[in-house]
């Protein structure tokens, strides 16, 4: 990390403050998962969310500057495997949609109708996101507002990832 001029701060709860909720900016899907996270069928239940990572980088003047990266993974609830992901320097629809497209291709072998579950972030309320799911006959599911337990599989993954990183 030092060779790349990165310096990471210690992990704190305060550093996990990214919130993608911007009110109702699109369609709110019903909560089809209802905390039934277990499945015996691979690629049937997929969960996603966006998280923010902060890191320090030394600029050309030798000063440390805070930078951010945004991760948009799609995780299979069958075995906890990350099927696809997008990384960007700003929260972007392009990152979410490209990761969504990869996840749809990977899960196309599922013999049953798939469900993609997320929180109510702006990216998952977009018409483009919803219409791609509809075109591929995939159910869209969203957590209740302000309820992290409805997407606890993804939140737990982020918690472990950040503890390992920082």
Residues covered by each model-derived region:
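Active-site beta-loop-alpha junctions of metal-dependent nucleic acid enzymes
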Residues: 67-68, 85-109
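Short small-residue beta-strand/loop micro-motif enriched in glycine and branched aliphatics
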Residues: 79-85, 140-143, 166
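Cysteine/selenocysteine-centered motifs that mediate thiol-based redox chemistry or coordinate metal-sulfur cofactors
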Residues: 108-127, 131
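RNase H-like two-metal-ion nuclease catalytic core shared by retroviral integrases
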Residues: 19-20, 24, 118-120, 126-127, ...
